[in-house]
Curated annotation (Swiss-Prot):
Residues 160-327 form the OBG-type G domain. Belongs to the TRAFAC class OBG-HflX-like GTPase superfamily. OBG GTPase family. Mg(2+) binds at S173, T193. It comes from Rhodopseudomonas palustris (strain BisB5). It is an enzyme of class 3 (hydrolase). One of its GO terms (biological process) is ribosome biogenesis. Pfam families: GTP1_OBG, MMR_HSR1. This is GTPase Obg. Monomer. HAMAP family: GTPase_Obg (MF_01454). Residues 1-159 form the Obg domain. Keywords: Cytoplasm, GTP-binding, Hydrolase, Magnesium, Metal-binding, Nucleotide-binding. It is found in: Cytoplasm. One of its GO terms (cellular component) is cytoplasm.
Length: 353
């Protein structure tokens, strides 16, 4: 299945049905009273977080979604039926953002969570509603109210416990394939990984989800390479595993490059707990490995782990370190900065005349 983490869609809730002007017509009853029914309410546009989805690819092929219109009222006091809601299914971790790409409307963090994005218009009153002691035969009715329409952005931020970051060719995909059943593409050239990959890791009986993010290069926050568009997927991670290639020219500079891009994207990423590991230790001589380790230690101000995704050396220790942090980190069930649900607001209703 193709991966798509951003989509722009048009949504419109259903219009309300019109009220009806009608009068009772029966034999021997010359002046039957009003009996026009009310119009039905238009359908809502609802977004629901569904299990089993991990991409927004469906919204590449369909961008317009309209809920059903309410049925018009009819004579004999027959009220119109309400229009059917339309439900958009999205993966857990999806954010709804306004057309300006800045205003966050809702953030889905749990399976089954629902959000009313646009309410259907209320149905109009039929003339029977306006009957009174002073107006026995009202000859007017309300039209139904129009539904709401807007363009919105759907943005997916995968929910993973831990995230893999590093320069291209740091060995992130090899590491993920070693510790999980994920099968990312692995090759000896930069940007082999074009989309985030997820894998379920088991460490001493404890399971967690690990995300492999496409490699970063200097200037990624300005669009260089694949840019920083995929960094949003590690915003929800509780810990980052920063892999540095031991065969690179200078491990310390490589570390600072990635840290600089993380900081340029969002300060919250640099505040996350980070485990630093020097990867591909099987591909360098002992003397060179010691130099790279010392360089990385000075840059990161912590002692790095020494691992090899190919031979598996040091990998169990890295997984235990991740699992220990994940086990201690609190999990928040609250959505992040969500706007008030439209359903909380009192809907407009036609006024009595």
């Amino acid at each position: 299945m193709k991966f798509l983490d951003e989509a722009k869609v048009y949504i419109r809730s259903g219009d309300g049905g019109n009220g009806c002007v009608a009068f009772r017509r029966e034999k021997f009853i010359e002046f039957g009273g009003p009996n026009g029914g009310n119009g039905g309410r238009g359908g809502d546009v609802v977004v629901e977080a569904a299990d089993g989805l991990n991409t927004l690819i469906d919204y590449r092929y369909q961008q317009h979604f309209k809920a059903q219109k309410g049925v018009n009222g009819m004579g004999s006091d027959r009220h119109g039926a309400n229009g059917k809601d339309i439900v958009l299914k999205v993966p857990v971790g999806t954010q709804i953002i306004d057309e300006d790409k800045e205003t966050l409307l809702h953030d889905f963090t749990k399976v089954g969570e629902r959000f009313v994005l646009a309410e259907g218009g209320n149905g109009g009153f039929g003339n029977a509603h306006f009957k009174s002691s002073t107006n026995r035969a009202p000859r007017h009715a309300n039209p139904g109210l129009p539904g709401e329409e807007r363009w919105i952005w759907l943005r997916l931020k995968l929910i993973a416990d831990a995230g893999l970051v590093g320069l291209p060719n740091a060995g992130k995909s090899t590491f993920l394939s070693k510790v999980s059943a994920a099968k990312p593409k692995i090759a000896d050239y930069p940007f082999t990984t074009l989309h985030p990959q997820l894998g379920v890791v088991n460490s001493d009986g404890r399971e967690f989800v690990l995300a492999d993010i496409p490699g970063l290069i200097e200037g990624a926050h300005e669009g260089a390479g694949l840019g920083d568009r995929f960094l949003g997927h590690v915003e929800r991670c509780r810990v980052l595993l920063h892999l540095i290639d031991a065969t690179c020219e200078h491990a310390g500079k490589a570390y600072k490059t990635v840290r600089g891009e993380l900081e340029a994207y969002a300060d919250t990423l640099t505040d996350k707990i980070e485990i630093v590991a020097l990867n591909k230790i099987d591909a360098v001589e002992p003397d060179e490995l010691k130099k790279q380790k010392d360089r990385l230690k000075r840059a990161a101000k912590k002692t790095p782990l020494l691992i090899s995704g190919v031979t598996g050396a040091g990998v169990p220790e890295a997984l235990r370190a991740l699992a220990a942090v994940i086990g201690e980190a609190p999990v928040s069930d609250k959505a992040i900065g969500t706007a008030q649900n439209a359903a909380d607001a009192k809907p407009w209703a036609p006024q009595d005349v």
